[in-house]
Amino acid sequence: RINQIEHGAETVSAGEMLTTQLIEHYGYEPQISMEDGLIILVKYLQHTDEVFIFDNTYLGKLKKVQEILLGYLLEIDRICRKYDIRYFLAGGTLLGAIRHHGFIPWDDDADVMMLREDYDRFMQVVQEELPENIFVQVPETEKGNHNPFTKLRINDTMFATEFTGHFMDMHNGIFFDVLAHDQTGNHRWSQKLHLMFTMLSRSIVFNKWGNTDIKSGGNHPVICRIVDHVKYLIPMPFAEWAQKKALTFFQNRNTDYLYDGMGRNLKRGAFPKSWLMETVYVDFEGYKFPVPKEYDQYLTWLYGDYMQMIPVSARRTSHSIVLTDLGAYGNYKI
């Protein structure tokens, strides 16, 4: 309820209920629904660190971050074309390509994916092909980094997340991710075992890295508690070796399924390898980029009804960025 709003000759009475219809009556056009506005208000009061996206964020820098990422996506595309390496837009970047023909308006990174054999070939040439201002961040190039996938970081920028902000000796520049989809078993039981060992090895590495506890929920709480107690006895090099072995366990086997062993969708399990065997090109921010020909099946597997827009109250960046500095890229143009 409101005390009083004056608008021209009309005055809203004290105590009158403020509604979307009343706002429109006085000539104002709401940018979001009243319901979304209330949800955002409640979430803001409960979680003041969350950023909700309408047009821009990061102090007006999100659009510029996306433009910078686009420039280096074009570099990846150039390298992959030169060496005939097959790759696809991935995750939210793929969803943005299909639904928005560009970045999702509230997305703050870019992702590409490859099959393992293409990923390994890409890693052999990427450092010599990329401009000098790009750092290839893998455990082999930076001692403090323990991600199972590759991050390409832009030098002389800052884009530190709530997690990586605790490791300021690491490169924390603007980043985009390069991930491999590895093979998994043909049978449900082998897929489940593969998934379990991958999750355990990744949990050990991540929680040793962040000095945090392994969550004991889920389907295997006893195993999680045991592993949490012994993880301190496992040297990090051995934990990373075990993680790599888990990811590539089926690499030289003839299987028909893949899984997202490196990424966020590990728990979704296996999907048919055939979905990533053919490529088509779609518009993305005015350029053509490759996506899986079976993108509909792949995106449905990831997101369900992926063309359905999420509520405004849920539109927020996927990373909790705590430090942002575009450096010399503040005026970047492709």
Tell me the role of every PLM-derived stretch.
Residues 122-124:
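Conserved SAM-binding loop
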Residues 34-49:
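Amphipathic terminal alpha-helices
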Residues 1-14, 19-20:
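C-terminal "lid/loop" region of Rossmann-like NAD(P)-dependent oxidoreductases
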Residues 77-110, 119-120, 274, 301-302:
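Active-site nucleotide-donor binding segment shared across nucleotidyl transfer reactions
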Residues 188-194:
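A short secondary-structure junction signal
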Residues 21-22, 50-60:
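Short glycine/proline-rich turn/loop motifs
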Residues 57-83, 126-186, 203-302, 309-334:
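Conserved catalytic core of two-metal-ion nucleotidyltransferases
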Residues 16-17, 31, 113, 290:
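Short aromatic/basic micro-patch
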